[in-house]
């Protein structure tokens, strides 16, 4: 089961980028298989997005192109955007005209061989367009993160 929280996890590398205008965290406990690494999680979410995520990104790119915002596939947008990493976490970030965001992919071991996978997002608005943009994106963001974790 995927759970939602609005706080950055304790000791997350993402904490150094706070404060933010928006924060969410989704997590899921997984067990009965090899541990997932942050790199594997990044690959699963961004390199092989769901058909829905791919379709929404194509629509987003069409809608934002007139505003001069960065466009491209999820994979293209996160390539070479790793801000920091540890053996259990990767933080990916991107700054555009309208907003700055970072996503943490945290894979924390738990007792009994299980693992807590947490995807945390923080957003900072660079200007009013960022706030308006994220108002429309937020429901889809929440849906897509939840679905990505449910597939694990």
Located regions from the model:
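Hydrophobic ligand-binding cavity/cleft-lining segments
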Residues: 1-67
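Hydrophobic-ligand binding "helix-grip"
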Residues: 72-111
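A conserved amphipathic terminal alpha-helix motif
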Residues: 133-152
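Low-complexity, charge- and small-residue-enriched intrinsically disordered regions
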Residues: 1, 68-77, 143-149
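Beta-strand/loop substructures that line and gate deep hydrophobic ligand-binding cavities in soluble
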Residues: 97-135
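Short C-terminal domain-edge/linker segments immediately following a structured domain
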Residues: 57-61, 121-125, 148-152
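Intrinsic-disorder/low-complexity, polar/charged segments enriched in Ser/Thr/Lys/Arg/Asp/Glu/Gln
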Residues: 23-27, 89, 116-118
